[in-house]
C-alpha cells in the first residue's frame, strides 16, 4: 500500500508493504526486510538490505547500510559502510550516523579543513573544563600497526561475531600509525568522572553495536590548551618566586 516508491533491480524492495517515498536501486536493495519506513534512498547490490521501519536513510555502494533495520537519518557511503567491522560498526538501530567506507579505507583527501559547528548561541550549561595537565601527563602515546579483527573469519556469514575474532598477524598492515589506545583513554576519563553511562565521555566513543572503540582526536585540543594554560601558570609562578629572591 506504499506510494511514490521507485524500485529498480531484482528482489529490490521485495518485502515492502506500507513504505512510501523510497528509492531502491540494485539487486536485493532493501530486499530482505518488511519495509514500512519512508523516504529511504539506496543504490547498490544489497544496500539497506535489512531495512524495516527506518526512515530518511541514504546508502550508496554494494552492501552499504546492510545492517540498518529501524535506524533513521543515517548516511552510509561506500562498500560495506555500516557493516560489522566497518569504522562505525554495524549500524542497525542507530540514528543520525554518517559512515564513510569500510575498514579498508586508508586515506581521505580533502582540500580544506573541516568546519565544525561551535556557535555559543547554541550552547548551554557552559563551564570551564577541568581536564588539563594531569590528564595529558597520564596519556600514553604509542606507535602501532593495524591488525583488524574484521579481516579474520567470514564477516559476511550470518553468525559472524567480531568479538570472537583474534588477530594473529596474518592481516597486519605494513604501515605504521600513531595515536592512543582507546581503552586506556577511556579509563582516564572515567577516573575523572567523565563516563559513557552518564553520556559525558569526551574523546572516547563506542560503536552502537558495542564492538569497537574509537577516539575523537580533535577533541583533545581543548584538553591540550587547558594543559598549556596550567603549565604556563606554573611557570609564571616559579618565575615570580625566582625574581623575588
Residues covered by each model-derived region:
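Glycine- and small/polar-enriched repetitive beta-structure motifs of secreted/surface proteins
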Residues: 1-119
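Intramolecular chaperone/auto-protease modules of tailspike-like proteins
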Residues: 118-245
Amino acid at each position: 500500500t506504499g506510494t511514490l516508491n521507485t524500485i529498480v533491480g531484482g528482489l529490490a524492495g521485495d518485502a515492502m508493504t506500507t513504505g512510501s517515498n523510497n528509492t531502491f536501486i540494485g539487486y536485493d536493495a532493501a530486499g530482505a526486510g518488511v519495509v514500512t519506513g519512508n523516504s529511504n534512498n539506496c543504490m547498490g547490490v544489497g544496500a539497506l538490505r535489512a531495512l524495516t521501519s527506518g526512515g530518511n536513510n541514504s546508502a550508496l555502494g554494494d552492501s552499504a547500510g546492510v545492517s540498518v533495520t529501524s535506524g533513521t537519518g543515517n548516511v552510509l557511503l561506500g562498500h560495506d559502510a555500516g557493516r560489522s567491522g566497518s569504522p562505525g560498526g554495524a549500524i542497525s538501530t542507530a540514528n543520525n550516523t554518517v559512515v564513510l567506507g569500510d575498514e579498508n579505507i586508508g586515506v581521505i583527501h580533502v582540500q580544506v579543513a573541516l568546519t565544525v559547528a561551535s556557535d555559543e548561541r547554541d550552547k548551554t550549561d557552559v563551564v570551564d573544563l577541568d581536564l588539563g595537565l594531569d590528564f595529558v601527563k597520564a596519556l600514553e602515546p604509542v606507535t602501532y600497526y593495524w591488525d583488524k579483527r574484521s579481516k579474520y573469519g567470514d564477516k559476511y556469514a550470518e553468525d559472524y561475531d567480531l568479538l570472537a575474532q583474534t588477530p594473529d598477524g596474518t592481516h597486519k598492515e605494513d604501515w605504521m600509525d600513531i595515536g592512543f589506545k582507546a581503552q586506556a583513554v577511556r579509563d582516564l576519563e572515567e577516573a575523572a568522572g567523565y563516563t559513557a553511562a552518564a553520556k559525558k565521555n569526551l574523546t572516547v566513543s563506542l560503536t552502537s553495536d558495542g564492538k569497537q572503540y574509537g577516539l575523537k582526536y580533535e577533541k583533545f585540543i581543548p584538553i591540550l590548551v587547558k594543559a598549556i594554560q596550567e603549565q604556563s601558570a606554573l611557570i609564571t609562578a616559579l618565575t615570580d618566586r625566582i625574581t623575588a629572591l
